[in-house]
Amino acid sequence: MTTFGAVAEWRLPSLRRATLWIPQWFAKKAIFNSPLEAAMAFPHLQQPSFLLASLKADSINKPFAQQCQDLVKVIEDFPAKELHTIFPWLVESIFGSLDGVLVGWNLRCLQGRVNPVEYSIVMEFLDPGGPMMKLVYKLQAEDYKFDFPVSYLPGPVKASIQECILPDSPLYHNKVQFTPTGGLGLNLALNPFEYYIFFFALSLITQKPLPVSLHVRTSDCAYFILVDRYLSWFLPTEGSVPPPLSSSPGGTSPSPPPRTPAIPFASYGLHHTSLLKRHISHQTSVNADPASHEIWRSETLLQVFVEMWLHHYSLEMYQKMQSPHAKLEVLHYRLSVSSALYSPAQPSLQALHAYQESFTPTEEHVLVVRLLLKHLHAFANSLKPEQASPSAHSHATSPLEEFKRAAVPRFVQQKLYLFLQHCFGHWPLDASFRAVLEMWLSYLQPWRYAPDKQAPGSDSQPRCVSEKWAPFVQENLLMYTKLFVGFLNRALRTDLVSPKHALMVFRVAKVFAQPNLAEMIQKGEQLFLEPELVIPHRQHRLFTAPTFTGSFLSPWPPAVTDASFKVKSHVYSLEGQDCKYTPMFGPEARTLVLRLAQLITQAKHTAKSISDQCAESPAGHSFLSWLGFSSMDTNGSYTANDLDEMGQDSVRKTDEYLEKALEYLRQIFRLSEAQLRQFTLALGTTQDENGKKQLPDCIVGEDGLILTPLGRYQIINGLRRFEIEYQGDPELQPIRSYEIASLVRTLFRLSSAINHRFAGQMAALCSRDDFLGSFCRYHLTEPGLASRHLLSPVGRRQVAGHTRGPRLSLRFLGSYRTLVSLLLAFFVASLFCVGPLPCTLLLTLGYVLYASAMTLLTERGKLHQP
């Protein structure tokens, strides 16, 4: 029994009350046991609006489970004529409003492990075979249309429609219409299935980002699971698309009929009819293949997901997509309608600038897109070998097979490339870029989702990429080459000492180092860089059409067998004929790879230096420092970078990732061992006499060292630093946060008076050669003052200035930790019935013994110095 099957009887309270009032209005009394009977008996009661008002009231007063049970009963009992009025409200109440104010059922936060009851109810209600989809098909059979505001579409689509330029996707063809008031209030006339999927897809974009404090795992939320279910249902890897649910036996939902456009549009791409209509025109017997009636749902689902999730990029990218042929067509259209009655309310420049607001996809958005790409690869690779071959492309091929063959290049490739470029250029330089990286790498490896994929190889012997994937690599050359160069530029600006950043470099290097993949990419670049063969007619038709738009069953010219021409058409279709291509295996990219290899070597040494410094600090040193008996570190410790709790395990992971990444880069670009060894030797020359702390990258000029761009980057990111020591009077250093300001100033005045009053006596005591002289020198002489000098990477010179004599420093008594330790000592002494005076004497005696021992050790160390 399902969740909704447990309901034995359903009553809508408001309609039930209405049936009780009816006998007061009519002489003949009648009792109705269901709202449906009352609605059918009294149609003049305006049942649809009354039903909507009742459902709205129940959504506030009733529990969520009861609301869903009521909705299931309404969908089953009421006809489509009455259900179409509640459909827009129901869709908005589920997915939230388009402006993001209403969150609806909050599918992005609903998780089965947190709210198991609500989760199961929602998943059953919104399942592809559930009640909500049954309502969609019920309305679909009656050919109802619903208005969707153009203003909530992605920026590029909205701007082009407001300019009366038809977007390249056939999803918008014959759907744009004006509102009765005119102006810019444009709407799309969508059928119920399109309206539902539009809201479902846009709820990922329009809703506000999840708060940071709310820890929600995207892969466990209801929205993510629903996306996976819809993709598995409408883009099946096995079998055909299940037929739609219907209230009548054997009934099916018709495909959307063509609509007459309400306003004239110019197109900046070659658009054609939908897949279903094109397929029907080529088939002699349509009824023989039931899938031909339903393939439009799969096509619509994919188009909506791609348009809503990937159609986001900057104004510059929008202008770059316009081919010369398209611009001439748009210009001719504008000249022809310049004297027409209709003129856009916004000038052209304003319309193009209408979507310049920055769009930054969230990590959740990227994870959902990655799920789409992984499923599309599995969907496209589910073709049988005889179906995937070019010779199988005939009129006998089913629409679903055609859809599998052309789904990725026809619908996804261009918009995904622009989306990835936008992410690579605008995503913050932090560890969250991992989501974008994995999305990109998932698209680059379709062989991982093939049904005949090999067993994963070990790390020492990765599996070889089969030659059958060479066409995919060549047809997606820019995905591999240009985005790889973009990743190199990002990696050179990140802190590779961080394990998360080191992992990203390792992941990319590992994917591109798969055997035979680098050779395929290099072969594709060679095909593109070959001298261009002039083919006037074909070249104009393909190179000037920047988008793979329209239906993939459109009558294109015969397929060109020349591999070089195919690669050129791919690059020019995405970047234009005037693009400046940077080869991945060219000198510019190789220079970036060498810089990255140098940065990896530096990051390994930096991580090792941090690990060594942490290991050298003994436990007892921190305890004495807390008690205030250790020397004050006036220059601070090495804080090279802001690692997340850097420890030995993190250092080990970083070193492992960087070591393997360096080896993979060497394999991909055939770097010699001598080149990598040169980086290590050059790194050793910049170390100081301790062999640990490294100076930033510099060159020696006439006035000393000059920072290189790499050196500036190292300082900004905390990878390197110059060792700057405090050379002034330690007593005049700024007051620390762990010191009492008023007490420090009082102690400074007291010690200054003592030093001024007894300077001669202290100098005489320190000049003695016996134990008393050593004891006084240990306490009255600044330990590092005599050896202070100006540090310079080029040379060293002693500090010019007068020599200070022995002095007394009482500043350590102004520290909170010193006072707390003294109070703690007095408290412990009081527990043993020791008074303040005896305790003071004991502390003084203990310190004298400690100082005497340190004096002897210091003098013995000086005797052994050369």
UniProtKB/Swiss-Prot annotation:
The modification Phosphoserine is found at residues 169, 285, 792. Disulfide bonds: none annotated. Its cofactor is Mg(2+). Induction: Expression is induced by DNA-damage and TNF. GO terms for cellular component: endoplasmic reticulum; endoplasmic reticulum membrane; Golgi apparatus; Golgi membrane; nuclear envelope; nuclear outer membrane; sarcolemma; trans-Golgi network. It catalyses: a sphingomyelin + H2O = phosphocholine + an N-acylsphing-4-enine + H(+). Optimum pH is 7.0. InterPro entries: Sphingomy_SMPD4. Widely expressed, with highest levels in heart and skeletal muscle. It is found in: Endoplasmic reticulum membrane; Golgi apparatus membrane; Nucleus envelope; Cell membrane, Sarcolemma. The keyword Ubl conjugation does not apply. It is an enzyme of class 3 (hydrolase). Keywords: Cell membrane, Disease variant, Endoplasmic reticulum, Golgi apparatus, Hydrolase, Intellectual disability, Lipid metabolism, Magnesium, Membrane, Metal-binding, Nucleus, Phosphoprotein, Transmembrane, Transmembrane helix. This is Sphingomyelin phosphodiesterase 4. It comes from Homo sapiens (Human). The gene is SMPD4.
